[in-house]
Every structure is written in C-alpha cells, then in structure tokens.
C-alpha cells in the first residue's frame, strides 16, 4: 500500500539535460536576442537622374504651344467683337435673327411663340400653314404635270410647272409671309401694306390655278379643274392627279381668303390704316428731298 506521504505520481518529472555542463552552468535567461538593425537598400531616392531630351521635339512643342495661345487670343478677340456688335445692335433696336427652321436644316428665322404677341399667334400660325400649303400645291402640281408629260403632253408644261415652284416658294415667303411676320412683331403699318398687296396676288394665283383656264398651253401646266376634265377621258390616271391638285388649290384659296379677312379686321381695328398713310407720306417726303 502506497504511503500517504509519497510524492504525487502525476507530477511532471524533472527534465535532465544530458548535455549540460557538469560543473554547473547558470541557466539561460528568458531574454530574447535583439534584432539586427535594418540595412538600407541600394536605392538612392535623393539623387537626380539626367534624362537626355530631344531638343528638336521640345522646340516643336513650344512652337505648337505658342500657336495655340495665339489662336486662343484670336478667338477671345473675335468673341469680344461679336459681343460688342450685339450690344450695339440691341441698343439701336436691331434684332439679330438666327436661322432655326426647319430644325434639320435651318434656312430661315422663325419663332412665333417668342416673337409674336399671344393674341396674334393663332393667326400667324394659320398664315404659316397657308405658306406651307402653297409649297404643297406647287409640289403636287409638278407631280401631276410630270404624269401628263410622261403620257405625251410635252415637256414645256413640265418646265412651266417647275418655274412655278422655283419662283413661288421663295417668292411667297419674301413677298407676303415675312412682311406679315414683321408686321405682327414690330407693329409696322408699311409691312401690313406689303402683306395685303402680295397676299391678294397669292389668292388670285391660287384661284386661277384651281380653274386653270386654257390660256397657256391649254392650262395643262397647272393642275386645275378644266385640264382635269379634259384629260380624264383619255388618261384616267393623269385626270385623277389633276383633280387632287384642283382640291389642293381650292383649299388653299379658301383658307387664304379667311386669313386676309382676319388680318384686315385686326388692321382696321388697331388703327394701323392711318399710321400706314402717315408712314407712306413720310417715306415719299424723304424720297423727294
């Protein structure tokens, strides 16, 4: 039976180092070895490195830089000149018009919503519709006359139809649409006078084209009712094209008559008639002097 004073059987036995010095060596301390100081890597960041540059390339860059600076100065000068001219024109009451219509290929300046008084915008839009209607009528007239030419009516009527289109489209804009636009925008009585004169000629032409009497080449250079009846019996397709042109010219005539009535009512009601007479008298006096 084990003695109650026997040592603990579970205690760790003392380790004996067989290589220990028999004479007794002081035990090693738990202190660790101090780390070695870091050695510098062989990169000298403070040293500058001379990279050989291409002097010719540097001179080209400097030359281009000077050219760019000169161009920039020239653009600034032009911008200042343009701003000065715009300011001078604004002080003088001159309106600088920027082409904005049609949107895909601007040819004219057209901004009814911002330049025409609100109570006149509807009438201006309808007048613009009559101008576009004239363009449509003359274009369809070319198509109808082309079919007649193909069917053997001769090339002369086609050339006349082309002349109507080339003269009528810009003529309508310059002679009566633009004067009314200017009259509504600037309240000019003389512009109203120009509009009335040439718009009445426009209405007369549309009525004449709708009838197309046999005055010039039996009237077949215009797609009216008389040539439509004439060619319908022998050439049905040509007759149909002429009847469509007749309908277009009739519609253009009716709407144009309504427009000139409305413009004249506004002209009389606003007292522009007396103003136009005074402006005409002053213009005649200046011309005489």
Curated annotation (Swiss-Prot):
Region called Disordered, residue ranges: 1-45
Coiled coil spans: 55-93
Protein's membrane topology: Multi-pass membrane protein
Membrane-spanning segments: 125-145, 157-177, 192-212, 240-260
Cellular compartments annotated: Cell membrane; Cytoplasmic vesicle, Secretory vesicle membrane
GO biological process, one term: protein transport
Chain positions found as Phosphoserine: 34
Chief location of this protein within or outside the cell: membrane
GO cellular component labels: endosome; Golgi apparatus; nucleus; plasma membrane; trans-Golgi network; transport vesicle membrane
Top-level taxon of the source organism: Eukaryota
Stretches of the chain found on the membrane's Cytoplasmic side: 1-124, 261-289
Keywords attached to this entry: Cell membrane, Coiled coil, Cytoplasmic vesicle, Membrane, Phosphoprotein, Transmembrane, Transmembrane helix, Transport
Role description: Probably involved in membrane trafficking.
Family: Belongs to the SCAMP family.
Name the UniProt record assigns to this protein: Secretory carrier-associated membrane protein 3
Organism this protein belongs to: Arabidopsis thaliana
Taxonomic lineage of the native organism: Eukaryota, Viridiplantae, Streptophyta, Embryophyta, Tracheophyta
